[in-house]
Structures are given as structure tokens and as C-alpha cells.
Amino acid sequence: MKKIFLFLSLVSVLGITSLFAISYDDNEYSRKSRAYTQLAEKAYDAGEYDTAIEYSQLAENFAQESAEYIKRMMARNEAEDAMNKARTRYAWAKQQKADKNYPTEYLIAGEAIKAGGIAFDNKNYDVAVTCAEKALESLKTVEPEDKVIAKAAADKAAAEKAAKEKAAREKSAKDKAAKEKAAKEKAAKDKAAKEKAAKEKAAKDKAAKEKAAKEKAAREMAAKEKAAKDKAAKEEAARKAAEEAAARKAAEEAAARKAAEEEAARIAAEEEAARKAAEEEAARKAAEEALYNEKGEKVLPSEYKVLTWKLDRECFWNIAKNPAVYNDPFMWRKLYEANKDKIPESNNPDWVEAETILVIPSIRGERREGLYDPDVKYQALPKR
């Protein structure tokens, strides 16, 4: 039984000593462990089993102390390597001015290295490794100073570009608002001018009718006064000539009545002729205004979709020349002024993009609606 125990003890000692044989093996404890192992083997061979057991236990104790020593030294080396890496990274970060560019990360790393150094001095190697790892983790985002400067310059350029683009958008919005305001003001002025013209025309028509009525009443009054004067003169002449001849008086009275009837008939004929002429003029104007609708043709378009220049030679001149537009190429400027905010360059009427929808303003009060259809026959706008 003692032989078996002694054998197992020797195997255990040899196992412990071989576990850390790679490094730090030649230390005070390992040397004593090996010495007692040899003594145990000799005592065992000599049959001194109790002595061999005692030596083997001493060898095992020193082997355990050697293993703990090796473990401490390995932990110390690991902590030392970790702290050296952290200090090296910290020194590099300082050269890159991390204290200015990454103040928070730099401060955290410095405090961690300081704490790690204290832990290392107190042989708390695990704590030292943790502190070193914390410092390295804090400094991992630190970049070289030239890269930081380049990034700052790029960020500044991007911010300036964004500011310029924002200013351009704001200016474009203001310009658009100004154009829309000007267009609304122009439309309001045009509407007011049309309303004023309509009122003036109505006033003129009313004045003309009143003048015609007054002239008619004056003519009727003059005719009545003349008839009365003629009648009085004839009656006076008849009274004076009563003695001369009753027959002549009767003839004169008949002639006076006939003259009065003829005058009344003439005035009535003139009034009837004036009335018919006014009715015919009104009918003629109504017929002219209804020409665009009563012939079964579509109302003139209010919009025009631009085709291509290369194939269709589309431009303001040719579009204005279209019978359904203005039937007059010289009206191209009217079309341009109404649509210059839709072309790439508002001050360049020669550049009109295909697919652009142009507005066709009315130039004579003609009715317009819908998009121009090249397959529909329109009543051409009469030329002046």
C-alpha cells in the first residue's frame, strides 16, 4: 500500500513540475522540488518507504509553490504587456493631439492607465489587464491628426456646400414666389382693365341709346310743332280767305292733312329703318361670336404640348403661326412672355424643351380650353 501511495505521489510531483516547464521552471521552488523527488526515488529504491513518502510530500509542496510562482509571473508578464501596449497607444494618441481632438477618450484612457499602474504595483495583475484593455478600447477610435484635420476640412466643405445649396433653394423659392406674385398682380390688372373696358362700353352704349331716344323725341316734337304751326297758319289763312272760297279752304285743309300724314309716315319709316339696322348689326355680331361653336368645330385650345425641334421644328414662331393658336407668327412674343418661366433659360426664347406644356393666352377675348390635339380640326383664328 505504501508503495502504491509513494508511486502516485511521485507521478503527481512530476506532473506538476512538467506543467510549467516551458517558462519560469528554473526557480527556487522547482529546484527544491526536483531535489526532494530524487531523494524520494533513492529512498524508494533503498526500501525506505516512509522516508520516500516524506520526501515525495515535500517535493509535491515545493512543486505547488513553483506552480503558483510561475502563474504569478505569467500574470505579471501578461499585465506588463497589456500596460505597455496601452501606454504606447496613449503616447501615440498624445502625439496626434488626442487631448484636443478626442478629449473624453484621452481622459478616460489616461485615468485607466494610471489605475492599471497602481494595480500592477500592488500585484493585482488581473485588474491591471482590465485597465489596460479599457484604455485601449477608449483610444481605438483615435485617428491620426492629419486624418482628423482632413475630415474636419471635408466636414467644413460639406457644411459650406449644404449652406450654399440651402441659400440657392431659398433664393429659387423667393424668385418663384415673386414671379407668381407678379403674375397674379398682372392677372388682376388685366381683369380690372377688362372690367373697366366693359363698363365704359356699357356706358357708351347706354349714352348712345339715350341720345338716339332724345333725338327721336326731338324729331317727333319738331314734327308736332311744325304740324301745329302749319295747321294754325292754314286755319288763319282759311279764316282770312273764308270769304274768298270755301272750296279753296277745303283743298288747303286736305293738303295740310296729307302733308302731316306723309311727314308722320316718313318719320315712322326712318324709325323702323333704324330699328332694323340695329337688330341686323346685333345679329351680325352674335353670329361672328358664335362662329367658333356653331360650325361643329372644337373650341380653340388653351394649352400646347411642345414637340421636337429636330423633327417638328417646334419654336415660339412656328407655334404662334398655327391657325389654332394665333394664326400669326408675329404673335410669338405674346406666347413667349406667358411661358418664359417654363423654359430652361427665361431670357432665351430660342430654347424650348420637348414635352413642355405651354399656356395659350386669349388675345381677343376668344374662348379657349383644353390641350391642343393635332388630329382635331379647329376654326382658325381670323387674322386682323
From Swiss-Prot:
Write out the entry's keywords from A to Z.
Answer: Cell outer membrane, Membrane, Repeat, Signal
* Membrane topology annotation: Peripheral membrane protein
Signal peptide residues are 1-21
Keyword Signal annotated: yes
Organism classification, top ranks? Bacteria, Pseudomonadati, Spirochaetota, Spirochaetia, Spirochaetales
GO cellular component terms listed in the entry, alphabetical order: cell outer membrane
Q: Where in or outside the cell is it found? A: Cell outer membrane
What is the organism field in this record? Answer: Treponema phagedenis
Residue ranges of the region described as 17 X 5 AA tandem repeats of K-A-A-[AKR]-[ED]: 151-235
**Role of this protein:** Tmp may serve as a porin or transport protein for large molecules.
Region described as 6 X 8 AA tandem repeats of [EA]-A-A-R-X-A-A-E: spans on this chain: 236-288
Keyword Membrane in annotation: yes
Q: Where is this region: Disordered?
A: 163-292
Query: What does the sequence similarity comment in the record state about its family?
Result: To T.pallidum TmpB.
Q: What is the name of the protein in this document?
A: Treponemal membrane protein B
Cite the repeat ranges for sequence.
151-155, 156-160, 161-165, 166-170, 171-175, 176-180, 181-185, 186-190, 191-195, 196-200, 201-205, 206-210, 211-215, 216-220, 221-225, 226-230, 231-235, 236-243, 245-252, 254-261, 263-270, 272-279, 281-288
